[in-house]
Amino acid sequence: MAQTEVERVRCLLDELERHQHQRKGAADTQAASLRLHLQEEEHASSPCKGRRVLCELLADEPLDGDAATPTATHALEIPASARRVFASGRQAFEDAADFEAYARTALEQAAFERACSKLSARERPGKDVLNLLVQEGYPAEASQAAVDKAKRCGVISDTRYAQAFVNSKTRSGWGKARISRELERFGLSLEDAGEEALDSLTQDREYERALAAASRRAMPSKNPTEKIARFLMGRGFATGLSLRVAKEVVAQAQEPSDE
């Protein structure tokens, strides 16, 4: 079995074990001094972009004999998208430390599920997913753990993303320099794309793409060489190559026709 398949199986087994543990915790009827309460109302919380939910730890303290009035002993704001994980998990805790340990695990699981949701629409690099989770309000540690798990499961692949990005942008007429700059924004390099994608960025291929891009452009009436060269450099082609191609295109356009 391939290494990636082994990792996917391990992830599935981890998920099965987690769900079994959740059901056991939810069904546990032993006495506990604290219980979980999720407020229904969601609210915005700067600087996070996502909605938030207040998660409280309540203690039933005796008041006026047999009556009991719930008292909040601990509160934690969680992203609204984490509500389902918290609502379906453990509901009773021995103390605040017990709850905090559980909350860390629950937030990691919720962040992982949210990452998978973000990736269902399109491929994203790990750094992009990490930033999205943090912006939504997940702790940095939980967000990083979720991204690492997604990479182990093959849900996130920086190599796969880099390959697709390079192939897409070369078809769009981008030059090597611009592609490299855009990849760096996501913490990636051209080498992450692999040899096959790099083959499309050789000097000969760069020249062909620059020539095709310049040929499709309408010939400027004034300073054509300068304007075409500037256009090519703006698309990420090297300065020397841009000037060379611009001169060739202008010279070809100025050649007298056979008629």
Q: Which functions belong to the PLM regions below?
A:
Residues M1-E259:
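An alpha-helical, amphipathic repeat domain used for nucleic-acid recognition
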